[in-house]
Structure formats: C-alpha cells, structure tokens
Amino acid sequence: MDPVDPEMPPWHHPGSKPQTPCNNCYCKRCCYHCYVCFTKKGLGISHGRKKRRRPAAAASYPDNKDPVPEQHTGRKQKRQEEQEKKVEKETGPSGQPCHQDSCNSCTRISGQ
C-alpha cells in the first residue's frame, strides 16, 4: 500500500477519484458520483459565495413596517346578506316555514 499524504483531502487519495469527471447534473446517479458530488448536490452544502441579504429596515422610519395583508370582509358580508335573503324568502319574515296555501306575509304567489 502506498503512503498517503496526510494533508491531502480524502477525495484526492489515490484510487478514490472516479473514472468520470464531475458534472452539473442533479440526478440520483450523479449525486452519488463521488464524495464531493454528494456533499454539493446530495446534501446541498456549498462553501462558495453566500447570497447577498437584503438590508434590514431602519428603525428610525416609523412608516417602514412589514405590510399586513388586508382582510376582505366585504365579499363575505355580501354573501351572508344574499344567503339571509334567500333563507328569509324560503321561511318567511317570521322565521317559520312558508306554507304556500296559507301564507299571507310572504311575497310568494301560491301555485309556484
């Protein structure tokens, strides 16, 4: 067995290098190609440049706050009103079920 340089990383040891070069493909076979491909592609560990972060909002500006999404209640209220009107038509204004023959307060015409 040949002596191995202790300062050399393990993927550069003799016999540990794969026959094919590394590529940019992220398929399962290429992710397990070698130790370096596994850490970069399989685990997503990269010691390259970090992405630039957005600067933090200055605390001195009171108007600069995180936007809060508005609640859209107008549409819900319209739907509720329509449903209440529909229920009122079906039951009558007193809340009792409408009997077509004996209904005097409902706008229904008997025979419909």
UniProtKB/Swiss-Prot annotation:
The modification Asymmetric dimethylarginine is found at R52, R53. Zn(2+) 1 binds at C22, H33, C34, C37. GO terms for cellular component: extracellular region; host cell cytoplasm; host cell nucleolus. GO terms for biological process: DNA-templated transcription; positive regulation of transcription elongation by RNA polymerase II; positive regulation of viral transcription; symbiont-mediated perturbation of host chromatin organization; symbiont-mediated suppression of host innate immune response; symbiont-mediated suppression of host translation initiation; symbiont-mediated suppression of host type I interferon-mediated signaling pathway. Residues 1-24 are annotated as: Interaction with human CREBBP. Residues 93-112 have a biased composition (Polar residues). It comes from the Viruses. Keywords: Acetylation, Activator, AIDS, Apoptosis, Host cytoplasm, Host nucleus, Host-virus interaction, Inhibition of host innate immune response by virus, Inhibition of host interferon signaling pathway by virus, Interferon antiviral system evasion, Isopeptide bond, Metal-binding, Methylation, Modulation of host chromatin by virus, Modulation of host PP1 activity by virus, Phosphoprotein, RNA-binding, Secreted, Transcription, Transcription regulation, Ubl conjugation, Viral immunoevasion, Zinc. Interacts with host CCNT1. Associates with the P-TEFb complex composed at least of Tat, P-TEFb (CDK9 and CCNT1), TAR RNA, RNA Pol II. Recruits the HATs CREBBP, TAF1/TFIID, EP300, PCAF and GCN5L2. Interacts with host KAT5/Tip60; this interaction targets the latter to degradation. Interacts with the host deacetylase SIRT1. Interacts with host capping enzyme RNGTT; this interaction stimulates RNGTT. Binds to host KDR, and to the host integrins ITGAV/ITGB3 and ITGA5/ITGB1. Interacts with host KPNB1/importin beta-1 without previous binding to KPNA1/importin alpha-1. Interacts with EIF2AK2. This is Protein Tat. It comes from Human immunodeficiency virus type 1 group O (isolate MVP5180).
